[in-house]
């Protein structure tokens, strides 16, 4: 039901704002985002796509792994959260603890700010996600290489 409602909302949404250079999408129905009928040609941002390995609402394959493997090598990243599902990747409501995704999201945003104008997608774009320092002590996070997603 949520994905069906999302289709109507996203078809009216303009994702081509040239001011946006990097975005984070957690467990999105990527097939809708990558659909050329909704403005893929106008997407000017690098994408950090995060998916839980046990997400039954938006399964990582075909919603994340397949589309990521087919995407151009423009500096996008796919991070899989081992054991993550659609509901345990967010910060616990009312608790002072942070989400398991806070470090990786912060690293991505910091990388985008540090890259400045060169943060835009492209084959020679600088890496926005450092090789380490963004993991979680409670859940394994894996940066999946494009080549591995193509399998």
Language-model features: locations:
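A conserved short beta-strand
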Residues: 1-2, 12-28
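Alpha/beta-hydrolase-fold serine-hydrolase catalytic core, especially in secreted/extracellular enzymes
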Residues: 83-84, 91-151
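Short beta-strand/loop motif that positions the catalytic acidic residue
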Residues: 43, 49-51
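Alpha/beta-hydrolase-fold catalytic nucleophile elbow
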Residues: 24-27, 50, 81-82
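Catalytic histidine neighborhood in serine/cysteine hydrolases
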Residues: 70-87
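Short alpha-helix in the alpha/beta-hydrolase fold that links the catalytic acid
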Residues: 36-38, 59-69
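Acidic catalytic loop of the alpha/beta-hydrolase fold
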Residues: 30-32, 54-58, 86
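Short, conserved loop/helix-junction motifs that constitute active-site signature segments
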Residues: 17-18, 38-44, 70-73
């Amino acid at each position: 039901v949520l994905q069906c409602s999302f289709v109507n909302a996203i078809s009216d949404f303009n994702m081509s704002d040239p001011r946006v250079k990097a975005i984070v999408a957690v467990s999105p129905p990527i097939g809708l985002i990558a659909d050329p009928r909704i403005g893929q040609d106008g997407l000017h941002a690098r994408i950090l796509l995060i998916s839980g390995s046990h997400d039954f609402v938006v399964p990582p394959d075909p919603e994340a792994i397949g589309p990521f493997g087919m995407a151009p090598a423009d500096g996008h990243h796919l991070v899989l959260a081992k054991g993550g599902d659609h509901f345990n990747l967010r910060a616990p409501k009312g608790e002072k603890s942070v989400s398991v995704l806070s470090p990786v999201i912060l690293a991505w945003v910091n990388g985008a700010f540090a890259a400045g104008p060169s943060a835009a997608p492209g084959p020679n774009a600088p890496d926005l996600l450092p090789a380490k320092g963004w993991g979680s002590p409670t859940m394994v996070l894996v940066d999946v290489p494009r080549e591995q997603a193509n399998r």
